[in-house]
């Protein structure tokens, strides 16, 4: 009989936890029904489309610093357009382009002087407008370190700060 009571109590607790609870919108992000940011990285080389019902953000991987250090080169632009198109299904979804990633080169050279930083920032704005993005994620791994086999400088940390301004 004790086991029956315990199982009944457990069943009641489980059922109560499944009740539809009102979601809080305290992230400060307009249109976000969740109190959390639920982000997925979607790759340029992938073929699947993420289920957006549980997501608040998608980071598209990847864009790279252009060869001339003055802009962005995007992997698989048609796929990026398709991912941005998911906002039609869920208008509150935010889509960002992640620029960089492991082994991404040219950040150090681009951030080293004001003219290339300014040109890069202007191109970020152009890319946001062209694709209807909600932002750019700078994924420089790692300023001041050649860990990923990329070029680096002792001034990278300071230059990264200047780039973010």
Q: What residue ranges belong to the model's regions?
A:
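C-terminal motif of bacterial Sec signal peptides marking the signal peptidase cleavage site
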Residues: 15-17
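Glycan-recognition patch characteristic of GH18 chitinases/ENGases
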Residues: 26-129, 144-146, 152-164
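Mobile, glycine-rich extracellular loop/lid and propeptide segments
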Residues: 136-143
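Bacterial signal peptide processing site
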Residues: 19-21
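Sec-dependent signal peptide recognition
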Residues: 2-12
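Parallel beta-helix/beta-solenoid
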Residues: 129-135
